[in-house]
């Protein structure tokens, strides 16, 4: 779906192949977790091979992705949940060019429970419930706002947290009024 909630295209197995290729071509930081797992990926990333078809990922059909691993990994299922393994629609990627994935709502396609509504650098990120999400009836939170905190004023953070301005906050035991937040 687009940031406006309009259907763009159905997610297909090929989107997962495109996503991994896009991450590899862009030398994504997240590849370090995967490069020794997927057959041929390390060679492609290093430039030893320039043929992505030698990488152990393929779309078997519209709804089946097959990964070939260098060796069995009991924790593989947790690796496929990382951002590097997300689907990328090739047509959308090509239409956005260098703007794909930039921090603006229209530069990203969405297939999860939330749509990005706004992102203000070093300030806030706001999400709204995706009305077209397949399991929307079980998404109980309508909107999410993540507020940036630079760590400079622990006292203010704790005050805001205890007064209900934040539902969660990373609090540090070195703050003078940390004890009051334990309850």
Each language-model region and where it sits:
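Second-shell loop/turn segments in exported
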Residues: 1-7, 53-55, 144-148
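Short, intrinsically disordered, charge-balanced linker/junction segments flanking boundaries
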Residues: 2-4, 70, 174-183
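Surface-exposed binding/hinge segments that line
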Residues: 7-91
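Gly/Pro-rich hinge or "lid" segments in bacterial periplasmic/extracellular proteins
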Residues: 50-54, 62-63, 69-139, 143
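Ligand-site clamp/hinge motif
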Residues: 100-105, 132-180
């Amino acid at each position: 779906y687009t940031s406006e909630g309009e259907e763009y295209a159905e997610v297909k197995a090929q989107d997962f192949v495109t996503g991994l290729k896009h991450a590899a071509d862009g030398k994504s930081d997240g590849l370090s977790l995967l490069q020794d797992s997927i057959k041929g990926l390390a060679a492609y990333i290093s430039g030893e091979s320039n043929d992505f078809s030698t990488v152990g990922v393929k779309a078997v059909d519209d709804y089946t992705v097959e990964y070939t691993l260098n060796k069995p990994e009991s924790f593989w299922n947790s690796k496929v949940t990382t951002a590097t393994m997300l689907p990328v629609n090739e047509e959308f990627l090509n239409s956005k060019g260098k703007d794909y994935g930039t921090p603006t709502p229209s530069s990203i396609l969405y297939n999860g429970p939330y749509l990005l509504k706004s992102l203000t650098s070093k300030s806030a990120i706001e999400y709204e419930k995706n009305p077209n999400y397949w399991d929307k009836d079980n998404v109980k939170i309508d909107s999410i706002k993540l507020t940036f905190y630079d760590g400079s004023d622990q006292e203010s953070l704790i005050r805001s947290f205890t007064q209900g301005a934040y539902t969660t906050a990373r609090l540090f035991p070195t703050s003078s009024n940390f004890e009051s937040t334990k309850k």
